[in-house]
């Protein structure tokens, strides 16, 4: 924790008392719950009849035509957000065959940082209570819509938040692969638009939540120590692990780089 952050009065007092209030308890993220409040940082959720809302609805309608395409298939593959699935999803971009078993320090870092960013996203979802796109306009989705989807909120996107969190952290760990890693993180969030379960504004807000939260998380000594350990782990894995198939990765990159709207 850095004691010079403005606007956090309780934190400032705790610094004077020598208390590290930003550090979360075991099992949480790197920050204490409630340490941040991003309501004034993230743009308000769009209103359906206003310009941002109209753009969301048009993008939702136009991307329904992607059903059956390679981009639609990628969106289906991006639905699972468990660590093993996400490591597979980023393996080509990273050029490292990561798994929770062979990179435990890396996955622990990614998941711990993701708990911080998810906490902020969940607070904003509850604050704005924005309906998902398929509740406003008809259109097919790439996954079965459970009751949980129908009663949960659109803005910001939790998947986009987590995907961008992973991308930013992995880019820090593997800086020579930063551009393709961040491109994959962008595409991971956009998959929710292709899938039809989130609006584009929700994906953009999810990225902003991840970036804003990580700006503070990165000041934590525990995070910095975890980065050093994960970087060493991935460097060792690069030396002994077989890189993902170049042909398969080339095909994936072509889909990642495909714009979903103009």
Name each region found by the language model.
Residues 17-19:
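N-terminal signal peptide c-region/cleavage motif recognized by signal peptidases
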Residues 24-194, 222, 226, 232-234, ...:
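Hydrophobic alpha-helical bundle signature of multipass membrane enzymes
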Residues 152-153, 198, 209, 228, ...:
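Short alpha-helix boundary/capping motifs
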